[in-house]
Amino acid sequence: MREKAYFHLPGLFEFYELYRMFLPLFREHREYFYDWCEIGSIYGAPADCIWGGGRAGFGENDPEEVLELMQEYGISARLTFSNSLLRQEHLSDRKCNALCRLFERNREPQNGVIIYSELLLEYIKEQYPGLYFVSSTTKVLTDFTQFEEEIRRKDFRYVVPDFRINKAFDKLNTLSQAEKDKVEFLCNECCWFGCRDRKACYETVSRKNLGENCPEHHCKAPDGARGYLFSKAMENPGFIGINDIRDIYLPMGFSNFKIEGRGLGSALILEFLLYYMTRSEYQIHVREKIYLDSMLDLF
């Protein structure tokens, strides 16, 4: 049994302005939020990071300001460096190395890297030993045996499996408590549950981040052209809602939950924060503090 759920939130660079408004609320008005939830980390990557993966980063905020905000609120910052196609010549990239140096400098709380490439893992372990590692969901670990092997690797503090493992309760319950503490479930994936192209989709993002000229990946999923809809994500067989977290996962001994959304708009990220962390009777208070006033026009 675990008492607290730790949410790992998207948009470290991409949604800096949103968090600059939300984090003071989370600290000063704790009564607005569920007492069983905390912020475990905020993750992301700025624009033009060749080590980036999963999504193309678009944050333009100054990394020192971003890190200063995280330090002020005692939140671990994670660099999303999950490019799966890195080669030796990419390891010398000045921008990505500078980010690692900066993020390694602060040890309380410790900052981390979400990673795919074994080459990059070994490089960062040697060059920036003060950073911890998260095994990226872009590895698409759908086989439970492979997932267990990943959990047992000492390199990783956390492992994010593919969302299709989320409800494999019989197998998940065979893990030891130490292993359960390393599992970080992806809660709100909108991708089609039967998708076979997930890895190819992520590889296209990796190629784009490397600046390669590559064809677009065209999603073949039913309703894929509609893009991300939170309502559709909630219907996904792998979706983890707040009742699931409180009534199933915490009692089973799991406590880490990742919210996706780096490539979405800030309005949708706010909806995630409201749904997963905010008591229903206070959601209007959070909206009013962040954007809603008597003169706001939508049409």
Roles of regions detected by a PLM:
Residues 1-150, 156-299:
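Active-site pocket-lining/capping segments in soluble small-molecule metabolic enzymes
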